[in-house]
Amino acid sequence: MSEVDKILYKLGYYDSDPHKKTEVQGYIDEAVEFMLDCGVKREKLTSQRAYAIKSIWADARDKGEVDDVIKKDGMVVALISQLRR
């Protein structure tokens, strides 16, 4: 099962259409770009913490809660700071 399929499953899309898969893959790509811009090394993008960030990001984007993803004391910021070490 691919990473995007696992995230789709967690979001509740068990047998999703190709459009939703492409949409969620775009969210994952956004999360990866954000992590790279924050200084996360490319080799850490396949870690469990990076996967958690991608899942949180995709979930928030899917719900339309874009502004709530990145907060000073939020989970995404905490995970990224751990990945930067």
Model-derived features: positions:
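Conserved short "hinge" loops at termini or chain/domain junctions
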Residues: M1-A52, S81-R85
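Protruding loop/beta-arch "assembly-hinge" segments enriched in small, turn-prone residues
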Residues: G64-R85
